């Protein structure tokens, strides 16, 4: 098979293969299927436009769908996140999270409904994420762009319940205020710390800690399948 920069290295494949524990003989190699998925993720091509050096697109799509519904992809993601955190000298379970949302224009009509974000004048969808102090994803929710942040933020915070026992604080921007702060503490036992911008400053300033979650959104831009959910 042709080599692409998105192909898994041997060490990367060994990590995934050990998690799958799938020793069955198949017509197409599972590694080649993963390589096809990563190629699509990076280039943003359509399933039907996958290069012929990969397994048939129908096969790749089938496995991707099965792994998604069975939680295999999430399992791999969580395992890799844990490895990175431990390598950085951190506990598997974070004590701090950072939350933010991003409205994205999209013309895709299938799947999640679209809406208009009145504040940003964006028609499409919004993704709400919570990351750890390294910028690694802890939870994500995608919804119509017109859904209020406090409503969708509750959904994404709810995904953390019972998963991260050490999580006690989430840092947010000025869009998360009022009753939402108290409701988050009451419902989930999590403190929401709001860090505001210095509006009186004419120059650009990096907001302490907040840049971490903003950098994660920037990472998404490197993969053409991710900017438009």
List where the protein language model places each region.
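Short alpha-helical elements
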Residues: 1-229
